[in-house]
Amino acid sequence: MSLTSYLAAPSRVLTMRLSARGGIVTVWPRVSQGKFCHCSKFVILSRRDDFYGRMTLAPLIDWKRRAADHQARAARYTVPARSRRDRGLPHPIEDFLFQYYPYPLALLDTWQPGIGLHCEWDSKTAPSPLPHGISERYHTGTDTHFFADPGRLTVKERDRLQWICGLLEAIANRAPNFACHGMHEWAMVHGGKEVRHEGTARLRLPQSEIDDLVESRPICCSHHDAFRFFAATAKPLNRLQPTLESRVMLEQPGCVHANMDLYKWAAKAMPWCGSELLLDCFELAVQLRDLDMRASPYDLSEWGRTPIRIETPDGRRCYEAEQKRLASMASPLRERLIAALRQTLAHHTPCQRSF
């Protein structure tokens, strides 16, 4: 592809292939005084130094449609959540994610493109340099486009993304374990001194039967955040003693809570992972939370949920089958999140440099 043909008919991908070396290079407007000039002057970056590797052009009509579709999809969760919050009627499953993970509803509502998408935008005629909801903190705008700019990352933010990426890679490379059968929710109410969700749901079994099950079944919870809510009397019964420091070594891809956490890590990786991946992770987390609570000792009949009775062999088989199904859905989301983080971290140096 020649530079002349590129200028005449812009490609959806801002890349050119060098025939002599076969390498991918990026064509990019030269920077002048913090802004991109007209496309008559270009620099070609080497493979090692290229900004994005491949940057996809998103025409205004395309990304506007994506944003509208995303907002409609997110509204299925955020509108009812706001209504329940205003009425003081929390849902033990659907509202848990907004309480356990303290991210605003607006984070789901607002569409952000994510790394590698170069969105058309006429800042000269628009009322603002960037579209509504697109933060100047992490995005760069030109006269004609805007994009998520990893050059705006601070060292602290880069280190946080690096840690998240390392954790996700460690989990992805580990064999799944499906032998826990959701005992963590039972261990949390062992002894009856503290029942976490008693404000929204009552227990479906007598305390003595709950305690007997916890004390008679093997508990092998590998998730730090779940384990830390165990009743003090149940913690010694767990085969593992996970800590914040050991989570990279212990968390595994079969774990309901580790897979639910994909929403948390995606939220922490915003705007780099993009809103569509964030919402994909959230929707999976809703299903995981549903499994979590249906297998718990709580009575959710008021909320239209049928219990998975893990106190029985049939219930444990049912739980394991559902756990495996959801873990298979979590795996590609984890890989997408890892890919977005790797791409961001690979190009975290500022794009607006001297050449």
Put a short name on every predicted segment:
Residues 242, 250-355:
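Charged low-complexity "KEKE/polyampholyte" interaction tracts
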Residues 47-167, 303-354:
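Active-site acidic/histidine clusters and adjacent loop/turn architecture
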Residues 134-148, 179-186, 257-262:
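Glycine-rich, often proline-containing surface loops adjacent to acidic residues and nearby aromatics
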Residues 2-22, 28-32:
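Low-acidity, Ser/Thr- and Arg-rich intrinsically disordered low-complexity segments
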Residues 4, 30, 179, 220-223, ...:
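Alpha-helix initiation and capping sites
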